[in-house]
Amino acid sequence: MLDKKVEKTFAEWMPINVRFLATYPDFLSMGIIIFFTVLLSTGMKSSKNFNNICTSLNLITMLTAVVACLTKVDINNWKISVNDIDETHRKHAGNGGFLPFGMAGVIAATPNCFFGYTGFESSSNASEEAKNPKRDIPIAIMISLLITLMSYFTISTVITLVWPYYLQDEHAAFPHVFEELGWTGVKWVITVGSTCALSTTMFGSMYTMPRVIYAMANDGLIFKSLSKVNSVTKTPLIATICSGAVAGVITTFIDLAQLVDFSTIESLLSYTIVPVSVLVLRYKATDDIKLEVSAEESIIPKSNIIQKLFNLNNQTASTKETSHIANCAILLYVLTAFFFTWILVHGVSVLPEVMYYICLSSTIIGLLLLIIIMLRQPESNATLHFKVPCSPFIPCASVTCNIYLMMQLNLFTWIGFVSWLVIGSLVYFAYGMRHSEENLDK
């Protein structure tokens, strides 16, 4: 927006020559983080009003861009032949046509695009503020996803119809297109509106984090002081300040592309845990059923293992035994899904052809068997207001797709991801496990 003057100035004055860090300390990003931290600390009402204003401006900007682009739509931009592209751009233009880089290119780019959808789950963290969370939260999530999907679908459609895909500017797509069209006024409207769009995205992320910290601290998983709610603002003030401080430091010194990858893999992990949790709760033992089992009966004869795994007796009530079988199947499914997706992404280049197909077919058979085992186990009879349909198929498909997208990310992202998991595990085993109220109750 400022012709990269800020970037050039800081890169010249304070260059950082470390591979995985930013090329310069981004103090502008830190200032924006501080602003949002202060805003969130003042209370929900002022934060909500600011977010509503930015969201409204964002929608107006999007509509302006779409309407302006509709006047220049050319369907031939989806039919460009690679032979019609000049030599300077041909080597980066793929094969031309509607899918110039094929489905492989679409799948490879999906994890980066996935970042645009993060934030819709923030509605679930507002359950304490909702009037009827059992009804409102699921509806809010579905509406948010639908609006986000339609928004991205619309803008990606019009921008590729207006300007050839190989001439797009990946850093500022709409401003670049309008500048090339000579519409300077529209360009600046879109630029300002895009800033509001970034504000809503940042607000969603920074709103969620303090409440996650609050929930963990309230249970005792992390320090109890982080669960204190300010009597004036009615917000978890300490958690908000701490999360803002950490976010500010990270955004100042970590490269933007790497931050996007970290955010993507963290989101994908969260979205993997959710369907796994759905499956665990679906097969949870029914509380009002208590079975007296002797020591002899607790030893399962080998002849009965298949019978119990596939519930050949057609048992309808979930017990601790059936729940244990289901949980083992869920765990094995997740591990097998990791191996299956690794084979899909990296197997062709690492394994011999025969071994590749043997491993691929074996994991597919294993995944199907585990789904059948889960399907045959009796479900919990707990009454729920919102229940995922077609279980275990939809949760298992979600787990597999999320892990597949995680496998598309680079090695350094995985190293950073594993490092964060190790740090989190150390905090949990050293402090959280001993102080968790949920764990103490059990």
PLM features per residue range, with description:
Residues 58, 68-71, 257, 262, ...:
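A generic transmembrane alpha-helix motif of multi-pass inner-membrane proteins
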Residues 24-86, 118, 141-144, 260-274, ...:
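Membrane-interface loop-to-helix entry segments
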